[in-house]
């Protein structure tokens, strides 16, 4: 029997507490019935709804038992297309780094960098004579 394939569009539709899909390593899981049992709390999973959760799943360092449990919720393989919508990746709320390279650097960050550079050279000039 052939593996079921699930499109990105389909995954994106399942993003609520009652109907929740996540993707880990291009495998799609329906974890709707697991929310209450998740040791890390249901909010962690809700934040990952309809997204690629590969990064956060790996970052947590789930045990072999947790990985086997996840397989019980497997429903198919993700079908990605070049011209179709892309699956959102996770951010800080979902346990990722929160860094989004598509966002410009804020002026406050530039000011912080400038202050640090000036402090570095002042330290070298006046303290490390």
Swiss-Prot record:
<comment type="function">
    <text>Membrane bound hemoprotein which function as an electron carrier for several membrane bound oxygenases.</text>
</comment>
<keyword id="KW-0496">Mitochondrion</keyword>
<feature type="domain" description="Cytochrome b5 heme-binding">
    <location>
        <begin position="3"/>
        <end position="79"/>
    </location>
</feature>
<keyword id="KW-0349">Heme</keyword>
<dbReference type="GO" id="GO:0005789">
    <property type="term" value="C:endoplasmic reticulum membrane"/>
</dbReference>
<keyword id="KW-0472">Membrane</keyword>
<dbReference type="Pfam" id="PF00173">
    <property type="entry name" value="Cyt-b5"/>
</dbReference>
<dbReference type="GO" id="GO:0020037">
    <property type="term" value="F:heme binding"/>
</dbReference>
<keyword id="KW-0812">Transmembrane</keyword>
<keyword id="KW-0249">Electron transport</keyword>
<dbReference type="GO" id="GO:0046872">
    <property type="term" value="F:metal ion binding"/>
</dbReference>
<keyword id="KW-0813">Transport</keyword>
<feature type="binding site" description="axial binding residue">
    <location>
        <position position="38"/>
    </location>
    <ligand>
        <name>heme</name>
    </ligand>
</feature>
<keyword id="KW-0256">Endoplasmic reticulum</keyword>
<feature type="binding site" description="axial binding residue">
    <location>
        <position position="62"/>
    </location>
    <ligand>
        <name>heme</name>
    </ligand>
</feature>
<dbReference type="InterPro" id="IPR036400">
    <property type="entry name" value="Cyt_B5-like_heme/steroid_sf"/>
</dbReference>
<dbReference type="InterPro" id="IPR018506">
    <property type="entry name" value="Cyt_B5_heme-BS"/>
</dbReference>
<dbReference type="GO" id="GO:0043231">
    <property type="term" value="C:intracellular membrane-bounded organelle"/>
</dbReference>
<keyword id="KW-0492">Microsome</keyword>
<dbReference type="GO" id="GO:0005739">
    <property type="term" value="C:mitochondrion"/>
</dbReference>
<keyword id="KW-1133">Transmembrane helix</keyword>
<feature type="transmembrane region" description="Helical">
    <location>
        <begin position="105"/>
        <end position="125"/>
    </location>
</feature>
<keyword id="KW-0408">Iron</keyword>
<dbReference type="GO" id="GO:0006696">
    <property type="term" value="P:ergosterol biosynthetic process"/>
</dbReference>
<dbReference type="InterPro" id="IPR001199">
    <property type="entry name" value="Cyt_B5-like_heme/steroid-bd"/>
</dbReference>
<dbReference type="InterPro" id="IPR050668">
    <property type="entry name" value="Cytochrome_b5"/>
</dbReference>
<comment type="similarity">
    <text>Belongs to the cytochrome b5 family.</text>
</comment>
<protein>
    <recommendedName>
        <fullName>Probable cytochrome b5 2</fullName>
    </recommendedName>
</protein>
<keyword id="KW-0479">Metal-binding</keyword>
<dbReference type="GO" id="GO:0009055">
    <property type="term" value="F:electron transfer activity"/>
</dbReference>
């Amino acid at each position: 029997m052939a593996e079921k394939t699930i499109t990105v569009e389909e995954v994106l539709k399942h993003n609520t507490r009652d109907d929740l899909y996540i993707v880990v390593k291009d495998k799609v899981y329906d974890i709707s019935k697991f929310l209450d049992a998740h040791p890390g709390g249901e909010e962690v999973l809700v934040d990952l709804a309809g997204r690629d959760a590969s990064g956060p799943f790996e970052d947590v360092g789930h045990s072999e038992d947790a990985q086997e449990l996840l397989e019980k919720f497997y429903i198919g393989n993700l079908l990605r297309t070049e011209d179709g919508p892309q699956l959102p990746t996770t951010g800080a709320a979902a346990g990722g780094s929160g860094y989004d390279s598509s966002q410009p650097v804020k002026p406050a960050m530039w000011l912080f960098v400038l202050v640090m550079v000036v402090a570095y050279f002042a330290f070298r000039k006046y303290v490390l004579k």
